[in-house]
A protein has these predicted regions:
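Extracellular/periplasmic carbohydrate-active domains that bind, remodel
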Residues: 1-181
Length: 181
């Protein structure tokens, strides 16, 4: 809780930032390149042994991408590496879920750039809720698979008897997308 990530550069083949069951988080002015995994991912897993939301999170002025590993840091911005072994496309996106037992509340993503990666994903499949989500002023360039992906499902990695999740009050506005597959 009470986490600030500001002006960081991460270039990896794993999740860049993996925020789980946290509140009062600010991620700003970060550049995250992750061709084989998610750049910035919010989760609300059941790892603590109880339900806990991820809430009051602001992600702003960030750049996420799926260029070759290491090429962002060295400035070459290459796209020569084979795709991720488990799928034929680059990842490098901002994502809420899929680990979603507790849920997500009061999340803002604004003024971010997605480049050569998958788009924005909002997913709740483990019984959690997604509510009061504000996505605005996003630029997407060379996006593969889906520019915006919403998923409400029932994978249910929560304790038995947990009801299905829900999505409420999600606002997505001012999206500029170029070259989206």
């Amino acid at each position: 809780d009470n986490l600030t990530l500001d002006n960081l550069k991460v270039d990896t083949n794993r999740d860049g930032f993996d925020i789980d069951c946290c509140k009062n988080v600010r991620i700003s002015r970060c550049s995250v390149n992750t061709p084989w995994d998610d750049a910035i991912v919010l989760k609300s897993s059941y790892a603590l042994g109880y339900f806990k939301d991820t809430e009051n999170v602001t992600i702003s002025d960030c750049f996420v991408s799926g260029y070759d590993r290491g090429s962002m840091l060295c400035g070459t911005w290459e796209l020569d590496e084979p795709q991720a072994p488990d799928h034929g496309y680059r990842t490098g996106r901002i994502k809420l879920g899929t680990e979603s037992s507790g849920g997500f509340k009061n999340i803002t993503v604004t003024n971010c750039i997605f480049e050569h990666c998958r788009g924005l994903a909002l997913e709740t499949v483990d019984g959690g809720h997604l509510e009061d989500i504000e996505i605005s002023h996003i630029t997407m360039r060379h996006i593969v698979n889906a520019g915006i992906f919403l998923r409400l499902g029932a994978r249910m990695r929560s304790p038995e008897g947990t009801p299905a999740g829900s999505m409420k009050r999600i606002r997505i506005s001012h999206i500029n997308a170029y070259d989206v597959d």
